[in-house]
C-alpha cells in the first residue's frame, strides 16, 4: 500500500496486484484498515482498462462542453451568484445513469450512441470490480463472500448507477460549494475523477482532507450509509464535500453499487443487531436530511426496523 500525503494526512492506496501473491494477507489487512479507520481510499491495478477510462472521461467532457455548459451558466443560480446572492444549491451540472437492474441511458438527452456503448463497456468492467471488492470486504468482516451482494439484492440483484457531474469554474468560490457536506446513502461508491482539477474533500479526525486529482486512473472508493449499517458500524460512511474553484472545471464520474430499492437492510446476522428496513424507505428520509448529521437519520431507521420486527 502506498500512502499519498495531502496536508500531512496520508490517504491509503491499495494495490490490487498484491492480492494475487505472497503479499495478499498484508494487502487484505491494509484494505480492512482503510475501510475501518478511513472510509475512503484509492485503488491501483484494479483491472479496469485504463485506455477505456480515458475515453470515458474525454467523451463526458465533450458532452458537457457541447450540451450542458451554456445551459449551466444561464441558470438562475449563476445569475444570483453574480449579484452576490447564495442559495441552498450545489454548483454542479449533473445527470444520473441507471445501469442495473434496468438502464435509462437511452432516455438521457443528447447521449450519442458511441458514448452509450463506451459507458456500457466501462460499467461492465466496473461492476466486476465492485463485486470483487464487496467479496473482499466480506472476507475481512468474517462474512460469507457473497453476503453484501445478497443483502443488496432485490429480485433482480443490486442496483448499479452512475452520477456524472461537472463542477464548473466558479467566480465566487467563497460563496458556493460544488456539493454540500453529506454522506452517501448507498453502499460502495467507485469514483473516476479529474486528473487535473481538485475539489473533493473528506472529513477525518476533525479536519477536512483534500483528495488530490486521480493520477494514472486510480479508482477512488468510499463507503456509504448502507455498508455502515450492514457492517454494524465497523465500516463507517464519511462526510465529504466538493469545493468550487475559480480556475478549472472538475469532472466526477461516481458509480454506486447500492441495494435494490426493495432490499431489506440490516446488520449481517454474524455482526449482530436485529433490525431491518427497506432501502427505499431510507432514501425517502435521506432526501430530506442529506445535508444534515447522519446520526439521527441512522437511529431513525434502526427504530423503524425494530418496530417492523416486533
UniProtKB/Swiss-Prot annotation:
Classification from the root reads: Eukaryota, Viridiplantae, Streptophyta, Embryophyta, Tracheophyta
One Pfam family of this protein, by short name?
Answer: 2OG-FeII_Oxy
Q: What is the primary gene name for this protein?
A: ACO1
| Biological process annotations from GO | cellular response to fatty acid; cellular response to nitric oxide; cellular response to potassium ion starvation; defense response; ethylene biosynthetic process
- Could you confirm whether the keyword Zinc appears in this record? no
What family is this protein classified in? Belongs to the iron/ascorbate-dependent oxidoreductase family.
Is Coiled coil among the key words of this record? Answer: yes
| Induction comment from the UniProt entry of this chain | Upon potassium K(+) and iron deprivation. Induced in leaf blades in low light intensities. Seems repressed by ethylene. Accumulates in response to very-long-chain fatty acids (VLCFAs C20:0 to C30:0). Induced in roots by nitric oxide (NO).
Quote the record's cofactor note.
Answer: Binds 1 Fe(2+) ion per subunit.
What this protein is called in its record is 1-aminocyclopropane-1-carboxylate oxidase 1
Entries under InterPro entries matching the protein:
DIOX_N, IPNS-like_FE2OG_OXY, IPNS-like_sf, Oxoglu/Fe-dep_dioxygenase_dom, Plant_2OG-oxidoreductases
Q: Which cofactor does it need?
A: Fe(2+)
Which residue ranges does the record assign to the Fe2OG dioxygenase domain? 158-259
Q: Which catalytic reaction applies to this protein?
A: 1-aminocyclopropane-1-carboxylate + L-ascorbate + O2 = ethene + L-dehydroascorbate + hydrogen cyanide + CO2 + 2 H2O
Q: Where does 2-oxoglutarate bind?
A: 250
Known pathway: Alkene biosynthesis; ethylene biosynthesis via S-adenosyl-L-methionine; ethylene from S-adenosyl-L-methionine: step 2/2
Q: Which residues form a coiled coil?
A: 113-133
Q: Which GO terms describe its molecular function?
A: 1-aminocyclopropane-1-carboxylate oxidase activity; L-ascorbic acid binding; metal ion binding
Q: Which residues bind Fe cation?
A: 182, 184, 240
Q: What does this protein do?
A: Enzyme involved in the ethylene biosynthesis. May promote stem elongation by maximizing the extensibility cells, possibly by activating ethylene biosynthesis, in response to very-long-chain fatty acids (VLCFAs C20:0 to C30:0).
Protein keywords:
Coiled coil, Ethylene biosynthesis, Iron, Metal-binding, Oxidoreductase, Plant defense, Vitamin C
- Cited SUPFAM superfamilies: Clavaminate synthase-like
Entry's EC annotation:
1.14.17.4
Amino acid at each position: 500500500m502506498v500512502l499519498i500525503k495531502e496536508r500531512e494526512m496520508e490517504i491509503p492506496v491499495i494495490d490490487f496486484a498484491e492480492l494475487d501473491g505472497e503479499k495478499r494477507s498484508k494487502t487484505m489487512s491494509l484494505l480492512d484498515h482503510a475501510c475501518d479507520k478511513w472510509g475512503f481510499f484509492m485503488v491501483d491495478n484494479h483491472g479496469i482498462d485504463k485506455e477505456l477510462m480515458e475515453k470515458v472521461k474525454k467523451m463526458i467532457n465533450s458532452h458537457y462542453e457541447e450540451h450542458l455548459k451554456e445551459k449551466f451558466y444561464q441558470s438562475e443560480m449563476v445569475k444570483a451568484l453574480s449579484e452576490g446572492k447564495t442559495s441552498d444549491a450545489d454548483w454542479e451540472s449533473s445527470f444520473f445513469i441507471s445501469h442495473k437492474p434496468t438502464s435509462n441511458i437511452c432516455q438521457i438527452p443528447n447521449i450519442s450512441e458511441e458514448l452509450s456503448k463506451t459507458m456500457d463497456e466501462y460499467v461492465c468492467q466496473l461492476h466486476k470490480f465492485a463485486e470483487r471488492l464487496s467479496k473482499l470486504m466480506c472476507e475481512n468482516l468474517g462474512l460469507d463472500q457473497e453476503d453484501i451482494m445478497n443483502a443488496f439484492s432485490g429480485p433482480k440483484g443490486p442496483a448499479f448507477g452512475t452520477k456524472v457531474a461537472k463542477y464548473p469554474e466558479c467566480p465566487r468560490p467563497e460563496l458556493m460549494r460544488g456539493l454540500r457536506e453529506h454522506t452517501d446513502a448507498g453502499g460502495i461508491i467507485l469514483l473516476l475523477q479529474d486528473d487535473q482539477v481538485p475539489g473533493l474533500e473528506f472529513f477525518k479526525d476533525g479536519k477536512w482532507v483534500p483528495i488530490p486529482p486521480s493520477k494514472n486512473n486510480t479508482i477512488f472508493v468510499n463507503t456509504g450509509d448502507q455498508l455502515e449499517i450492514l457492517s454494524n458500524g465497523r465500516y463507517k460512511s464519511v462526510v465529504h464535500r466538493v469545493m468550487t474553484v475559480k480556475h478549472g472545471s472538475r469532472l466526477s464520474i461516481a458509480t454506486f453499487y447500492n441495494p435494490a430499492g426493495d432490499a431489506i437492510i440490516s446488520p449481517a446476522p454474524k455482526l449482530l443487531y436485529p433490525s431491518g428496513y427497506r432501502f427505499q424507505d431510507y432514501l425517502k428520509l435521506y432526501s430530506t436530511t442529506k445535508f444534515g448529521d447522519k446520526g439521527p437519520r441512522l437511529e431513525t431507521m434502526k427504530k423503524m426496523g425494530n418496530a417492523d420486527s416486533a
